[in-house]
Amino acid sequence: MSSRSRSRASSAARITDEQIGDLVSKLQALLPEARLRSNDRVPSARVLQETCSYIRSLHREVDDLSERLAELLAAADVSTAQAAVIRGLLM
């Protein structure tokens, strides 16, 4: 591959500041935090920090729900059809 071809391929793969801003804006729209939904300009770093915090909280919630479900299944009658269906879905 010539250096000209590499240069063209490299520039085609680069993302513009406008594209980054658009992606951050879309990411911000996915966050449940009301304070981030204001019309004020929120720095990209803040949006990324809030996104990471939100993902961590979702992981904790999944862990808590998994633990709760395991407790419920352990307490349920092993022979019940519902417990068997739930166990099958989790496997």
Curated annotation (Swiss-Prot):
Residues 4-58 form the bHLH domain. SUPFAM superfamilies: HLH, helix-loop-helix DNA-binding domain. Coiled coil: none annotated. Keywords: Growth regulation, Transcription, Transcription regulation. One of its GO terms (molecular function) is protein dimerization activity. The keyword Transcription applies. GO terms for biological process: regulation of DNA-templated transcription; regulation of growth. PROSITE patterns: BHLH (PS50888). The keyword Transcription regulation applies. Belongs to the bHLH protein family. Atypical and probable non DNA-binding bHLH transcription factor that integrates multiple signaling pathways to regulate cell elongation and plant development. This is Transcription factor ILI7. The gene is ILI7.
